[in-house]
Amino acid sequence: MFSGIVQGTGKISKIISKKNHITLEISAPKNFNKNLKKGASVSVNGICLTSLDNGKKNLKFDVINETLSKTNIGKARKGSLVNLERSITASTEIGGHLMSGHVHFAGKIEKIITKNTNKDIQIKSQK
């Protein structure tokens, strides 16, 4: 589970295409990977992905075709920036909303309305 509060921005350093998935390598901000364990859940642009290792050098994730078909992560390229969040724990302050990061479908941005320093984004469901 995640709070929905972005904890840092990572940069895609490598994308490896495979038969049924891609592997993403992402450089994360300093200390983001601290105590990360293989199998940990990390939100990448709101998508719950499973860490392939302990992230000592870069974060590494396999992204299956189902996830690629339901999200826009497949449009990311080497050098693209992504939002990152570690999963919450029993002692984590929840300052946002509980989110699973399990994406069911993509929506289309219909309109962006700027009000002072805020933006209202209208999204149309494709379902």
Where are these regions (language model features)?
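Conserved loop->alpha-helix
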Residues: M1-K127
